[in-house]
């Protein structure tokens, strides 16, 4: 498509920004490109040439005595007897569940694939997930799963009784395929509860008697699961919890009748178009009403929690049992999401007692379950009340709060609680926000922030810890180093067994022309420090001028400047450096970098405004410091929130950015969902100007450079509707652009044969065509 180059340029006052010294995480290539086979899109995305080693699903046993993994069975079956080449091929009958002793790494097959073959079949069940009963006498297998929005949360469940070796399917003799959700054992292992048709059922395993616990689903009522927006923005899918004594189940009920439906059209799968309709509350629209019920398993009677002032203007993002079977802890949040009240709820009558209130001037940006200590007198809680995200121990009545971590840094995750030895383990990085390390503090508050990860593991470290905190699967990677995994004894970080080295991938990477990279910092116009990374070609020559491509996200759901392996995303960037580009990324304010409350919440009421200014400031600082960056050839791209940022950079700073590729953007913030957008942008009635100015569509008339706009028509998250409205606005002002729609693809634009290869080829060609 021929695109008209516009001659009207907006003036911009140049603001002085400075580039700070490079951090110690800088890494320079040790060799230049010599006879290396160049990377191609096909090598990365079609041939799987650089696929990472896969360790498989690992799960620690509840007592910490070892872990289980799913591995291909050595048992085979004969196939293809009638094939044209007269050969017989052997293939595995399925997968085994094996046990590993962490001390010796001795391997034992606990469940063989043969045990998972249903009567009359010759192939074992495919294991999508599994759960042990507490006494490990029964295994719950999840299989034949189907995608519901983001995850495969609907499927078939089977029980394997290890005492009788009997395999049976749950849901009754007339159960429909892939119709059960979130099945889990009662604490004593005698029953399994699950959701089907938006109601909760419990099945007794001894006789497979099924009892319906809720019966009011339908006409917008859903029990034990969530509507689209709760699932997406509160990251919750499983909507019910067994009591510790197994006599009750606490559950969410959502009444979505007040929420308007969004409708998507599918033009490709049938002869005539089909429609998908689901409740989706947009900004300012009516939400679902959330309630918490506690149902008695024996008589199916529900007691409702008496939450004060509960309405469609309130949220219930978290709920769980409170260390006993008599009370449930409920978190109750107002629509503005600046106040979270924690209530202890009596299951006998639904009465509630307020024990803790978290309140912010602007918004609460995370929700976490309270983690109860074994005695039930205290729970572990994360809070930003000090200005930094830290861990606290809170007494049952909320009267005593002890800070277990301290300092001018954020913890990112609680990893494990070792009550026996008095430790809590967590992830943090006080000295470098691009990295992650394991720390621990004493549960009594006497010692905090003891680093466990050794210094040689500079980069990003993750830990899958046993429940007692004694053992862990340690995963380590850095910017240009693929993930490796080892089994460690946590005390002293003692490496016991190497589980994954990625040796093959490392050899393949060594054969490539390795680009230079470094992490750096710039100071924005108001003195705030911004972090980023930059990649330069292996044959880099500082006396030359290079076009630069920025990868951007820039919203509260993602940090891009991280010292970790990014897989194919890194390889695509490396390919771009081989083709003569410099690649960079900057984290602006509002991203979830562990830099404190003020950093993350400075964007309130102005999403897209301050963040785009930060990006522009960073670009100007970089071009002032590094003369090899060609300021006339600046490109940018991003997906989702990054797609929105790409549009804002092209529209708000057209004199700086010449080429942009925007994937699945939120073109108008008023079209996005209520929970996310109102959390960060405020209520529309209070911040109408912020919504207006922060939305790219408002500034579409300023487009001067090259824009490639991409969206999937089946996007249930960021609706295609917004892109169509943006297209109308660009047409209105005769702004020429390129556009690609992917029929019926969802937000990730991954479904369908050849989609990723096609997408990445198009993006690569676009930058080469317009930025060189």
What are these regions (language model features)?
Residues 8-12, 16-459, 468-471, 481, ...:
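Beta-propeller folds
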Residues 260-261, 317-318, 325, 461-772:
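Serine-hydrolase catalytic core recognition
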Residues 1-5:
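N-terminal secretory signal peptides that target proteins for export/translocation
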């Amino acid at each position: 498509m021929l695109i008209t180059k516009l001659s009207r340029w907006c003036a911009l006052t140049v603001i002085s920004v400075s580039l700070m010294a490079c951090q110690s995480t800088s890494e320079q290539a040790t060799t230049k490109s010599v006879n290396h086979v160049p990377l191609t899109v096909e090598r990365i995305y079609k041939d799987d040439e650089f696929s990472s080693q896969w360790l498989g699903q690992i799960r620690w046993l509840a007592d910490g005595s070892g872990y289980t993994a799913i591995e291909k069975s050595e048992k085979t079956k004969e196939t293809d007897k009638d094939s044209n080449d007269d050969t017989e091929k052997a293939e595995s009958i399925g997968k085994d569940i094996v046990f590993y002793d962490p001390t010796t790494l001795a391997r034992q097959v606990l469940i063989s694939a043969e045990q998972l073959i249903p009567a009359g079949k010759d192939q074992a069940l495919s294991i999508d997930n599994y759960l042990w009963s507490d006494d490990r006498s029964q295994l719950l297998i999840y299989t034949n799963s189907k995608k519901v929005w983001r995850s495969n949360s609907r499927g078939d469940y089977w029980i394997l009784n290890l005492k009788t070796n009997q395999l049976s399917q749950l849901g009754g003799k007339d159960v429909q395929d892939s119709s059960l959700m979130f099945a889990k054992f009662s604490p004593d292992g005698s029953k399994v509860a699950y959701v089907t048709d938006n109601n909760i059922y419990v099945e007794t395993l001894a006789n497979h008697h099924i009892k319906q616990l809720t019966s009011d689903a339908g006409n917008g009522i859903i029990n034990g699961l969530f509507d689209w927006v709760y699932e997406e923005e509160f990251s919750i899918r499983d909507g019910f919890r067994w009591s510790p004594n197994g006599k009750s189940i606490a559950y969410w009920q959502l009444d979505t009748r007040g929420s308007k439906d969004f409708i998507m059209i599918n033009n490709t799968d049938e002869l005539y178009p089909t429609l998908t309709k689901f409740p989706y509350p947009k900004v300012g629209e009516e939400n679902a009403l959330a309630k918490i019920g506690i149902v008695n398993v024996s008589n199916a009677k529900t007691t409702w929690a008496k939450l004060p002032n509960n309405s469609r203007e309130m949220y219930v993002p978290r709920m769980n049992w409170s260390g006993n079977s008599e009370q449930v802890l409920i978190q109750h949040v107002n629509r503005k999401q600046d106040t979270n009240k924690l209530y202890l709820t009596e299951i006998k009558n639904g009465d509630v007692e307020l024990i803790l209130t978290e309140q912010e001037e602007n918004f609460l940006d995370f929700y976490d379950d309270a983690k109860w200590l074994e005695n039930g007198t205290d729970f572990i809680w994360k809070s930003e009340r000090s200005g930094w995200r830290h861990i606290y121990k809170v007494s049952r009545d909320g009267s005593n709060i002890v800070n277990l971590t301290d300092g001018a840094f954020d913890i990112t995750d609680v990893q494990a609680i070792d009550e026996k030895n008095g430790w809590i383990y967590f992830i943090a990085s006080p000295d470098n926000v691009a990295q992650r390390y394991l720390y621990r503090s004493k549960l009594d508050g006497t010692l905090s922030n003891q680093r466990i990860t050794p210094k040689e593991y500079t980069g990003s470290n993750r830990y899958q810890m046993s429940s007692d905190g004694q053992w862990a699967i340690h995963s380590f990677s850095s910017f240009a180093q693929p993930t490796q995994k080892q089994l460690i004894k946590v005390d002293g970080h003692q490496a016991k067994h190497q589980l994954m080295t990625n040796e093959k991938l490392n050899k393949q990477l060594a054969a490539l022309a390795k680009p230079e990279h470094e992490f750096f910092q710039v100071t924005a116009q108001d003195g705030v420090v911004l972090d980023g990374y930059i990649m330069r070609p292996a044959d880099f020559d500082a006396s030359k001028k290079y076009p630069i491509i920025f990868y951007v996200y820039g919203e509260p759901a993602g940090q891009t400047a991280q010292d970790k392996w990014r897989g194919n995303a890194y390889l695509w960037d490396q390919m771009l450096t081989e083709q003569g580009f410099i690649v960079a990324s900057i984290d602006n304010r509002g991203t979830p970098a562990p830099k404190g409350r003020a950093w993350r919440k400075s964007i309130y009421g102005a999403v897209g405004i301050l963040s785009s200014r930060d990006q522009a400031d960073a670009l100007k600082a970089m071009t002032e410091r590094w003369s090899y960056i060609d300021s006339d050839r600046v490109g940018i791209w991003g997906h989702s929130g990054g797609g929105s940022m790409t549009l804002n950079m092209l529209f708000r700073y057209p004199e700086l950015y010449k080429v942009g590729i925007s994937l699945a953007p939120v073109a108008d913030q008023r079209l996005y969902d209520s929970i996310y957008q109102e959390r960060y942008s405020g209520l529309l009635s209070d911040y109408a100007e912020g919504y207006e100015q922060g939305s790219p569509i408002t500034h579409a008339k300023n487009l001067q450079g090259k824009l490639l706009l991409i969206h999937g028509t089946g996007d249930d998250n960021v609706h295609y509707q917004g892109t169509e409205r943006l297209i109308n606005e660009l047409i209105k002002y005769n702004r020429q652009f390129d556009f690609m729609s992917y029929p019926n693809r969802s937000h990730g634009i991954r479904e369908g044969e050849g989609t990723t290869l096609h997408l990445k080829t198009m993006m690569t060609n676009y930058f080469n065509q317009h930025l060189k």
